[in-house]
Regions:
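Structural/interface elements that position substrates and couple domains in central-metabolism enzymes
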Residues: 1-395
Length: 395
C-alpha cells in the first residue's frame, strides 16, 4: 500500500520528486521498467547525480518511506499516481501521444476510481484534457491534474522546494487535491488552466532555447569576422543590467529544450519561426565548428579529441548531447577521433590525459569543471564555451 506511486520513478524527474515526498512523510513507491535502476535505488545508491539525493535516499530507505518496484500492480494501491511520462517527438518532429495508451486503456490500465492522477512531465498542449476525457470514457472516476516540473538536472531536489509549483486540473477537486499535496514541498503555488500550464512549461524551455540560439548566432557572427565573442559579451553585460541574463555560447542540447521548442512549433501549426530558427542555429553549431576547423587544420591527417560528451557540464546524462553530433562530423573529416568524459562509461572513452597526448587538435564538447586543471600541453583547443585557460574562442 502506498500514498503515492510515481510512474517512471527512477529517472531524473521522478526520483527526486519521490524522495522529496518521502522526506515529507508520505509513503512513496517508484515504479520503473529499468531493473538495474530499481535494484540500485533499492540498495540505496542513486543511479545519477543530484545534489543532496545520496544522503536523502539512504534516509528514506531506512525509514521505509520509499521503495522502487517493477510491478505495475502497485498503481492500484495508491491514492495518488504521478506520471513522469512526457510526449516525445517522432522522426517527423510530431508529438507522440500514444505513450499514454497503456495508462488509458480500459483493459490494461491499473488506475481505479477515486485516485488523483498527476501528469508531471512536459506534454503537448491539450494532453491533460485528452487524458481526463479518455479515462472518463473508459469508466474511471479519476481526478486529473497537470503539475509540471521545471527543475534543472543535478539540482532537482533543491529546486523542487525553491521554485513555485504550477498547479492545474480538469476539475476543482483535482486542483484542490493537487494543491494540498504540493504544499508539502513548497508554499508557492500558481494556479492556471490546464492548457495554460502546459504552455508555461513549453514557454519556459523554449525561451531558454531561443536565448542560447541568440548567443550562438552572435558567437558565429563575431567569429566569422575574427573577433572574440567573449570580449564583446563582457562589454555587453558588464555593469549593464539590461543584458545581465545574456548567456554564453555553447551547445544547447539535452532531453528537453529542442523537444519542447519543436512541440510548441507543432502546436502553432509550424508557424513558430523563432523556434525553428533557434533549432537551426543550435543544431548547426557543431558542424559550424568543424567547418571552421577544416579551413585552418588538415583534419584528414589529424587525430582529434573531444573533451566532454554529456549534454551539460558536470552532469552524467548523455541524452541528446550535441557532443555526439560533433563526434559524428569529426569522424567523417578526421583521421581518428578520441573522446573523454568522467561521467560516461563507454568502450570508446579514453582518459583526458591520453586524449591530450594523442590529439593534434582538441574540441571542448562539454565544459566539465574537472578539465580546468588539465595540462593541455600547448595543444590547440577549440572552446566555444571559453571554459579552459588557453582555449581558442576564435576559430
Amino acid at each position: 500500500m502506498a500514498d503515492i506511486v510515481i510512474i517512471g520513478g527512477c529517472g531524473h524527474v521522478g526520483l527526486p520528486l519521490g524522495l522529496a515526498f518521502a522526506k515529507a512523510g508520505r509513503k512513496v513507491v517508484a515504479l520503473d521498467i529499468d531493473a538495474e535502476k530499481v535494484a540500485s535505488t533499492n540498495a540505496g545508491k542513486m543511479p545519477f547525480i543530484d545534489a543532496g539525493a545520496d544522503e536523502l535516499l539512504l534516509e528514506v530507505r531506512k525509514s521505509k518511506k520509499f521503495e522502487c518496484t517493477l510491478d505495475a500492480s502497485v498503481i492500484s494501491t495508491a491514492d495518488v499516481v504521478i506520471t513522469v511520462i512526457g510526449t516525445p517527438l517522432d522522426e517527423h518532429l510530431n508529438p507522440r501521444l500514444e505513450v499514454y495508451q497503456d495508462l488509458l486503456s480500459k483493459d490494461r490500465s491499473r488506475l481505479r476510481s477515486g485516485q488523483l492522477l498527476i501528469m508531471r512531465s512536459t506534454v503537448y498542449p491539450g494532453t491533460t484534457e485528452h487524458v481526463a476525457h479518455a479515462l472518463k470514457s473508459a469508466g474511471f472516476d479519476v481526478d486529473v491534474a497537470f503539475c509540471p516540473e521545471r527543475v534543472a538536472q543535478g539540482v532537482a531536489l533543491e529546486e523542487i522546494h525553491s521554485l513555485p509549483q504550477i498547479v492545474s486540473g480538469t476539475s476543482e477537486r483535482a486542483i484542490a487535491r493537487a494543491t494540498e499535496l504540493f504544499k508539502l514541498l513548497t508554499p508557492d503555488i500558481i494556479l492556471l488552466p490546464t492548457v495554460g500550464a502546459e504552455l508555461t512549461k513549453l514557454y519556459n524551455n523554449t525561451w531558454r532555447y531561443i536565448q542560447f540560439a541568440v548567443a550562438n548566432q552572435f558567437y558565429m557572427i563575431a567569429n566569422d569576422y575574427g573577433l572574440d565573442f567573449y570580449d564583446i559579451h563582457h562589454a555587453m553585460t558588464e555593469k549593464y543590467p539590461r543584458a545581465r541574463g545574456f548567456p554564453k555560447a555553447g551547445f544547447a542540447a539535452g532531453p528537453c529544450l529542442f523537444k519542447d521548442a519543436m512541440q510548441l512549433a507543432c502546436f502553432d501549426n509550424n508557424a513558430f519561426f523563432l523556434g525553428h530558427s533557434a533549432m537551426l542555429v543550435n543544431e548547426g553549431l557543431p558542424n559550424y565548428l568543424v567547418r571552421r576547423a577544416a579551413q585552418k587544420y588538415d583534419l584528414r591527417n589529424l587525430t582529434v579529441g573531444i573533451l566532454g560528451m554529456t549534454f551539460k557540464a558536470d552532469c552524467d546524462d548523455p541524452r541528446d548531447s550535441l557532443a555526439f553530433k560533433l563526434r559524428k562530423s569529426l569522424k567523417f573529416e578526421c583521421k581518428e577521433v578520441l573522446a573523454a568524459d568522467p561521467y560516461l562509461d563507454k568502450p570508446w572513452i579514453v582518459s583526458p590525459e591520453e586524449l591530450v597526448e594523442r590529439s593534434g587538435l582538441i574540441f571542448v564538447g562539454t565544459p566539465h569543471s574537472a578539465y580546468k586543471k588539465l595540462n593541455l600541453k600547448g595543444k590547440p583547443v577549440i572552446d566555444c564555451w571559453k571554459s579552459l585557460p588557453g582555449g581558442m574562442t576564435v576559430v
